[in-house]
Amino acid sequence: MKIKSSLKSLKKRDLNSKLVRRRGRVYIINKTNPKFKARQK
């Protein structure tokens, strides 16, 4: 999982990426290609 201060560019990397908020943190999840997971710092 990548940890970045800005997730906008990471969201554009794949069409299936979704932005999710969990416990006050922002995540990018991707069911079809899990290598695109990311969390905002």
From Swiss-Prot:
Coiled-coil stretches: none
Q: Which GO terms describe its cellular component?
A: ribonucleoprotein complex; ribosome
Domain of life according to the entry? Bacteria
Q: Membrane-spanning residues where?
A: none
Q: Which cysteines are joined by disulfide bonds?
A: none
Q: Which UniProt keywords apply?
A: Ribonucleoprotein, Ribosomal protein
What taxonomic classification does the UniProt entry list for its organism? Bacteria, Pseudomonadati, Pseudomonadota, Alphaproteobacteria, Candidatus Pelagibacterales
Please give the family membership noted in the entry.
Belongs to the bacterial ribosomal protein bL36 family.
Q: Tell me the GO molecular function terms.
A: structural constituent of ribosome
Identify the species of origin. Answer: Pelagibacter ubique (strain HTCC1062)
One Gene Ontology term of the biological-process aspect is:
translation
| A Pfam family of this chain | Ribosomal_L36
Protein name as annotated:
Large ribosomal subunit protein bL36
**Database matches in NCBIfam families:** PRK00831.1 (NF002021), rpmJ_bact (TIGR01022)
Question: Does the record's keyword annotation contain rRNA-binding?
Answer: no
Stored PANTHER family:
50S RIBOSOMAL PROTEIN L36 2 (PTHR47781), LARGE RIBOSOMAL SUBUNIT PROTEIN BL36B (PTHR47781:SF1)
